[in-house]
Amino acid sequence: MPSSLHAPLSGEVSAFSLSCPYFRCQDSTGEDLGRFPSPLPFLMCLLLFFPFRARWPRLMSSEKPGESPKPQKMAQPGGSQKKETSRSVPVTDPTSHNSEINQRDQQFSDMHLADLQKVFEKEADENGALKKEGFIRIMKGVLSSMSEEMLELLFLKVDSDCNGFVTWQKYVDYMMREFQGKEEMRKSQYRLRFHLPMTVIPL
């Protein structure tokens, strides 16, 4: 058993063994009180831990290149996001819908109405009325590229009151409505050009 220094029970001086993590206490009469664990290992751990604990926040906050994730760049509303939106979402022309009908109306607007009126009145009856069969036959002779289904659709659009026949005045009124509608659409598209490219708000 290694030698140890003894101290009185009063606790003025703590006795501990340098070679063993235990110390033996005796009272003033010399009676052995037993062997107790030495606080030396605990004190040494505290001395080693406190300096490391002081540096711990700095070690945790330090960033090493290559290990820490790179911060993501926030997309600016007026920057690259607009360019990506303009590339991924093409601006479509509203008049692209029903392109065949628009092409047909453009051909009608370019035609000489005087010549068409002569053919129209020749096929109409004494009241100036022209039924669907005669209307389709006239339009086939004028616009041979149009299908019969499209000509039937045109007849229904001209016959707005659904009487089953059309007159030259009805046809002129239809042409005026189409022209005014196209003019309003053209003006609205012209005004929209000042607001492009539109800003897309992300969800």
Swiss-Prot record:
Residues 61-107 are annotated as: Disordered. SUPFAM superfamilies: EF-hand. Residues 111-145, 146-181 form the EF-hand domain. Residues 87-107 have a biased composition (Polar residues). InterPro entries: EF-hand-dom_pair, EF_hand_dom, WD-EF-hand_domain. One of its GO terms (molecular function) is calcium ion binding. The keyword S-adenosyl-L-methionine does not apply. The keyword Aminoacyl-tRNA synthetase does not apply. Coiled coil: none annotated. It comes from the Eukaryota. Keywords: Repeat. This is EF-hand calcium-binding domain-containing protein 8. It comes from Mus musculus (Mouse). The gene is Efcab8.
